[in-house]
Amino acid sequence: MAESKVVVPESVLKKIKRQEEWALAKKDEAVAAKKKSVEARKLIFKRAEQYAKEYAEKDNELIRLKREAKLKGGFYVDPEAKLLFIIRIRGINAIDPKTKKILQLLRLRQIFNGVFLKVNKATVNMLRRVEPYVTYGYPNLKSVKELIYKRGYGKLNHQRIALTDNSIVDQALGKHGIICVEDLIHEIMTVGPHFKEANNFLWPFQLKAPLGGLKKKRNHYVEGGDAGNRENFINELVRRMN
């Protein structure tokens, strides 16, 4: 007796074919994703090396200029700062509506919130208005790095996301050529062409109360208090609050 031939319905054959095609596509996708990941890691490493070299060259140039000025019997004057870090040091008691509005515009809604700010006429005018409620100064590379690595959160799809992975930065800022945390640090530190986008991506930093406390929050820094411009000494305060 001849064996009966099993006829597989066409719909089943089509389904099997679709599954095979899907599996092949997923495999190709995985290979492409792995290749892209390897290339991205190489690029990130290369950029990190490039930035380290750039920062070192800048430091060496600064040392050279200071030595040169000293040899000539003068002193070196730092170029005008482009970047500020502002920390809110007072609450809402007895605060007038205009000052409150400016603090909100600066994204300093809570005490010990901190934000980066580009120096220009508009920001300087705003800072003058809210000076009794904030302290600020010129952050160095160490401060910018430590703030972003230790307390950095980004805004992605209206969510506050910890910067635990370069892919978070890439998703939000990749279209601006900022694909990793080191790119983000460089854009902030150098006040680059996409500083606004990079800074808006960063959630305001929530710092802790400073070790040793604050002296006199109502008095200006130059009067022995805490408010206002403390120039390079902001970095010492960042260490105490980070």
From Swiss-Prot:
<dbReference type="InterPro" id="IPR035808">
    <property type="entry name" value="Ribosomal_uL30_euk_arc"/>
</dbReference>
<dbReference type="GO" id="GO:0003735">
    <property type="term" value="F:structural constituent of ribosome"/>
</dbReference>
<dbReference type="InterPro" id="IPR016082">
    <property type="entry name" value="Ribosomal_uL30_ferredoxin-like"/>
</dbReference>
<dbReference type="GO" id="GO:0005840">
    <property type="term" value="C:ribosome"/>
</dbReference>
<dbReference type="Pfam" id="PF08079">
    <property type="entry name" value="Ribosomal_L30_N"/>
</dbReference>
<comment type="similarity">
    <text>Belongs to the universal ribosomal protein uL30 family.</text>
</comment>
<dbReference type="InterPro" id="IPR036919">
    <property type="entry name" value="Ribo_uL30_ferredoxin-like_sf"/>
</dbReference>
<dbReference type="InterPro" id="IPR012988">
    <property type="entry name" value="Ribosomal_uL30_N_euk"/>
</dbReference>
<dbReference type="GO" id="GO:1990904">
    <property type="term" value="C:ribonucleoprotein complex"/>
</dbReference>
<dbReference type="InterPro" id="IPR039699">
    <property type="entry name" value="Ribosomal_uL30"/>
</dbReference>
<dbReference type="Pfam" id="PF00327">
    <property type="entry name" value="Ribosomal_L30"/>
</dbReference>
<dbReference type="InterPro" id="IPR018038">
    <property type="entry name" value="Ribosomal_uL30_CS"/>
</dbReference>
<dbReference type="GO" id="GO:0003723">
    <property type="term" value="F:RNA binding"/>
</dbReference>
<keyword id="KW-0687">Ribonucleoprotein</keyword>
<keyword id="KW-0689">Ribosomal protein</keyword>
<dbReference type="InterPro" id="IPR005998">
    <property type="entry name" value="Ribosomal_uL30_euk"/>
</dbReference>
<protein>
    <recommendedName>
        <fullName>Large ribosomal subunit protein uL30x</fullName>
    </recommendedName>
</protein>
<dbReference type="GO" id="GO:0000463">
    <property type="term" value="P:maturation of LSU-rRNA from tricistronic rRNA transcript (SSU-rRNA, 5.8S rRNA, LSU-rRNA)"/>
</dbReference>
